[in-house]
Amino acid sequence: MPSLAVIGHLSRDVVAGAAPRIGGGSWHATRALVALGADAVIVAACGTDDEDAFRAALAETGVPFELHAHGATTAFSFSYDAVGTRTMTVDAIAEPFAPEVEADWVQVAPLLRGDVVVPRAPHVLLDGQGLVRRPALGPLQLDADFDAELLRGVSILKLSDEEAAVIGPVDVPELVVTHGMRGATVNGTHIAADPVDADPTGAGDMFAAAYLAARAAGAEPVEAGRSASAVVSALLSDKLSQGRTRP
């Protein structure tokens, strides 16, 4: 049994009008897991039309995985401005996914509210976009209309600045807020990041995976945050990816 699992839908992403590409938190997390050599498994879902291509892409990473295909693939189109602010549109929505996993540390990487059932595990990291992103087609909408029961059993909540502003105060054992190019805050302690001029897509997912891997290895929260920040900066600048199979 691997010590760490990442679960969530894969997505079909169109960035700045380019050709569609594989995306989603469970995909971007593999980049950090490969760089760290983590003992991990990916448990992902996609639509039947994308199954063959997405299965091949996951296989190339070298990370053990399960891929469940049914219905449609969640799809997004988005772009970034000069300071990294993202404009995003929901083009298609997949059916909810309820995976079974056996791991002590689980990263739950939803794309929209309600699209992944949070499993029971000793340590669960939940990405806050699964709380605030409305499952509706069109321009991405955020609100705080989520069931607070979703946080029951969550050990670590990872939010972006925008998500944190929507949710407001929250009571969880560990709170991680990412600030894009400005680093992150872990339980109130700010962690700086080395600025990198690169496509930031998936940086939050990589941070979450690296953070959880560090916690699983025994690091305390702030130490894990510093480790994750360094990993993401290195990955975005390609310093950890050279010579390795990666997404």
Q: What is the predicted function of each stretch?
A:
Residues 22-25, 139-145, 192-193:
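Charged helix-capping and loop-helix junction motifs
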Residues 60-66, 88-89, 103-106, 121-126, ...:
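Active-site regions of enzymes building and remodeling cell-envelope glycoconjugates
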Residues 174, 194-247:
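Conserved post-catalytic alpha-helical subdomain immediately downstream of the catalytic base
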Residues 76-77, 133-139, 186-188, 198-205:
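Short, charged, surface-exposed secondary-structure boundary motifs
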Residues 105-170, 181-183:
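Conserved beta-alpha-beta core of the PfkB/ribokinase-like small-molecule kinase fold
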Residues 2-6, 11-20, 34-115, 119-123:
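Conserved N-terminal subdomain of the carbohydrate kinase-like
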Residues 33, 160, 204:
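Short, conserved phosphate/pyrophosphate- and ester-handling motifs at nucleotide-, phospho-/glycolipid
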Residues 24-35:
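Histidine-anchored nucleotide/phosphate-binding helix
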